Amino acid sequence: VIELRGSHQRFPSSKLPNDHDIAPGQSISNGLFEEGLMTNQTQTHQVTLDFYTLNDLRTIAKTLPRLELHPDVITKIEAGAQFVLEKAAEDRYIYGTNTGFGSLCETRVENEEMEMLQFNHVVSHAVGVGEIVPESLSRLMMFIKLLTFRTGHTGISMAPVQRLIDMWNNDIMPAIPKKGTVGASGDLAPLAHMALPLLGLGKVYYQGEIVESAGVLDAMGWEPLRLKPKEGLALTNGVQYINARGAQCLMRIEEMMKTADLFAAMSSQAFSTSETFYQAPYHETTFHPERKTVATNMRKVL
């Protein structure tokens, strides 16, 4: 008998708890896509410069901790914002900062008009249509957007970033229409709708209802933000709506895979099949980790 041992190396484990395998008695959905859930005020997650995996996003979506920024993240954001302010003051054309957009890229915008330029950019792109996406999708999209600000490369200042964190921590989620992305060129409309509440415009999910953001800002004692150079562009550029939808699709697929493993185990027991095919030694002959995962899941529930 020749004993074969695989040398397959799994990807490095996430810094957050693994939630892929089935545990006896574990709920399949475990509240992952439930709506109207509130932030866990007893648990805090510090947003760092580390890479976030799908498993990290899943854990955040399930546990809904309060958010705060690591000091290193704050330093990078502040440095990036200062860099943009310095460049905007120079006598040179900087796209979307002291110039118009698209075909107006060579039209200079004066210093006193830069704030209005960013405001108009956000408002003019908030033209999404269709039904409002679920609150869970809006929340995940907003978290992924926060991750894009960590390096300071967008040039956004701390005020909009902190406002998004405050909205998360107080269960205030942007109400975002379903249709409006232009794909790889950017989720312009969805992200613009995400940014509207920062300006006291648009609507939000709040206390189980969709309401005008202006009233919520008044209730929280928050003033509408005034965008600095490039901040409207930083808020609307990106594919975080697509990212969030894709992440949720993958999470749902993995939940379906868990269900399939349960059905396979139930069928095996119902038909009194041999136990050999899901025992660990049998799967040491393969380099496919997915086979091992399915076999492990079946053993856990049998």
Locate each region found by the language model.
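Conserved, well-structured ligand/cofactor-binding cores
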Residues: 39-302
